From Swiss-Prot:
Its cofactor is Mg(2+). Homohexamer ring. The helix loader is a DnaB(6):DnaC(6) complex with a cracked opening large enough to allow ssDNA into the central cavity. Component of the replication restart primosome, which is composed of PriA, PriB, PriC, DnaB and DnaT; DnaC is required to load the helicase on the replication fork DNA while DnaG primase associates transiently with this complex. Interacts with PriC alone and in the DnaB-DnaC complex, probably 1:1 binding with PriC. (Microbial infection) Forms a DnaB(6):lambda P(5) complex in the presence of ssDNA. Lambda P helicase loader reconfigures the DnaB hexameric ring, generating an opening large enough to permit ssDNA into the central channel. It is an enzyme of class 5 (isomerase). Transmembrane segments: none annotated. Disulfide bonds: none annotated. InterPro entries: AAA+_ATPase, DNA_heli_DnaB-like_N_sf, DNA_helicase_DnaB, DNA_helicase_DnaB-like_C, DNA_helicase_DnaB-like_N, DNA_helicase_N/primase_C, P-loop_NTPase. This is Replicative DNA helicase DnaB. 5'-3' DNA helicase activity is stimulated 2-fold by single-stranded binding protein (SSB) and 6-fold by SSB and DnaG primase. Residues 1-27 are annotated as: Disordered. ATP binds at S234, K237, T238, R442. Hexameric enzyme depends on Mg(2+); in its absence, DnaB is trimeric. Loader protein DnaC alters the inter-domain and inter-subunit interactions of DnaB, inducing an open ring conformation that allows ssDNA to access the interior of the DnaB(6)DnaC(6) ring.
Amino acid sequence: MAGNKPFNKQQAEPRERDPQVAGLKVPPHSIEAEQSVLGGLMLDNERWDDVAERVVADDFYTRPHRHIFTEMARLQESGSPIDLITLAESLERQGQLDSVGGFAYLAELSKNTPSAANISAYADIVRERAVVREMISVANEIAEAGFDPQGRTSEDLLDLAESRVFKIAESRANKDEGPKNIADVLDATVARIEQLFQQPHDGVTGVNTGYDDLNKKTAGLQPSDLIIVAARPSMGKTTFAMNLVENAAMLQDKPVLIFSLEMPSEQIMMRSLASLSRVDQTKIRTGQLDDEDWARISGTMGILLEKRNIYIDDSSGLTPTEVRSRARRIAREHGGIGLIMIDYLQLMRVPALSDNRTLEIAEISRSLKALAKELNVPVVALSQLNRSLEQRADKRPVNSDLRESGSIEQDADLIMFIYRDEVYHENSDLKGIAEIIIGKQRNGPIGTVRLTFNGQWSRFDNYAGPQYDDE
């Protein structure tokens, strides 16, 4: 009979394809993988956790499969078994049994899945296809926005594109994340301790700050930490942050990245030349240099050009997604980053949250912490302080003085305030001395470190004066 003839693919295809039909593309999916996941769960309820940490209902391509998985989740949460009978009855109660194909389709799912042995691999396939479909959806959304910008600039559209794509990555937890057995954590911890034991580091396990007393307090700037440097105007917060960058660049080979939202790159470079050459920055700004000054600057330039590991981005009004994409590019090109510095946090923007400053700052702070973790690099972000501290007798900052402080204080691993008494008291006994007040340190002590401030060189140096109370 004709029905028994083998299927011929060429015979099934029309000789001339309809151009409109040919232009239609079916989103990536795997019906077989979805069926195997659902069937496997009916065979072995114990595999639910393996599947649930990989996929959610929306990852399934067909609506019936989404409904079935949702109902399975409801049964699991109520402590009921998931099998052909309980699932069919539950779907019946929700009025969805017929829409998913009836009892017959559920029976087919169960019958056609021989075992749940490979269910994790099938779930990974479902998840992978779902991510690609999300990317296609976002790409279409970006294209629509390009055709109909509604008054948005190209920069706004780029920010939209980056944020939508990054949101896919952020919403998809890595399958390597999640709870780990203490044995695995201990193995990794002991391996790290052994590594530190075998490598001489003088107590500095992170990025060397260049300041002995600060290193003793912090053990260096730790990878994945968000570090906030805050001060009132004229205290030298940009100078201090730049000195951290310079010291990191000189003491290691990894690139350091500066996002200067307030100051152009030429001014940043002039400060660095003054600091590293120990030449009066006023002379550099005015060009009134003698032969000795030129010799010092030439020597510094030679070192900087030899290392070539400082990158400066002086774009204004950057968004977290722009900072993230540019930092990622540098990290990708150089196999990592040693340090990221942002001057300063409140000059960043999140267009979608511009109507609510508190939420905007919270998103910026959260994003910078996420960047530090993603690239495993210390991120130093400068921050403003509230004017209210000017009304106090003791004007040394505390954590609550951070402007829009709630989210910043919560996200930060290390908070350092700069205080110079001579700014407020002309006849202070502490002229030329800066206090670095550690207001918060998630994994270390708080306290105060003294540094010598050489303003003419735009530089903080190690303190060599009498002993002081560092509590």
